[in-house]
Amino acid sequence: MIRVAVIGAGNISPAHIKGYLAFPDRCRIVALCDIYPEKAERKKAEFHLDGAQIYSSHREMLQRDDIDLVSVCTPPYTHAEIAIDFMRAGKNVLVEKPMASSLEECDRMIETERETGATMGIVAQNRFTDPVMKLKQIADTGLAGRIVHAQVDSLWWRGHCYYDLWWRGSWEKEGGGCTLNHVVHNIDMLGWLMGRPKKVTAVLSNASHDNAEVEDISIAVLQ
């Protein structure tokens, strides 16, 4: 039985909770944490997680020996600290995208994983959809011949109010805009299908959101 703690009770947490609840013979959620504990309490009630303990800080959970896996569902600027703390405490971690808000933080997370022997995963669910898995098979087997060009578009509407949430829209807390927020799925998928690029040329801009520092449009060419 994998004993799970979910850190962050915001909009993405139900996806993680439902995923674990789909396998009751293999997973059990034993803890929920949010800086606003009443949000965690609501998730506990909504999903009938009767045995789950509520916390307001992830540090309160580090010494628990009955946690095997931690889902990190918090804003990007907190990912590195939380993931590193839990890996050093002997827990495996599943981190929501984006991995972190800077490359330096990503490097520290990877280094900690190697040092501790913990397992760290980053959410990239598109790899596991049937169409993408079929594309991967076609690319790997050469069924379609040599692929000379691939194009990915991620046209995702973000209304002006999207950035009214306190942590969204700043370089410090979110680390980026559309590129890290949703295009990261397409970048991951393209890299998985085609391999890592040798050269990247990109343009980022904020065209429509005066309440955000980060980009709301990005265009890149990968070679």
Language model features with spans:
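Rossmann-like NAD(P)(H) cofactor-binding subdomain of soluble oxidoreductases
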Residues: T78, P98, G121-R127
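Beta-loop-alpha module in the N-terminal Rossmann-like domain of NAD(P)-dependent dehydrogenases
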Residues: H16, L49-T112
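Predominantly a Rossmann-like dinucleotide-binding segment in NAD(P)-dependent oxidoreductases
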Residues: T119, N126-A212
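Short loop/edge segments at beta-strand edges and connector loops
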Residues: S56, V95, A124, T201-L204
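Active-site beta-strand termini and strand-to-loop segments that position acidic
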Residues: A220-Q223
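Structural signature of beta-strand start/N-cap positions in the alpha/beta core
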Residues: R3, R28-I29, D66-L69, N92, ...
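N-terminal Rossmann-like dinucleotide-binding module
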Residues: M1-H48
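Core-facing hydrophobic residues within beta-strands of well-ordered domains
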Residues: C27-I29, G51, I67, I147, ...
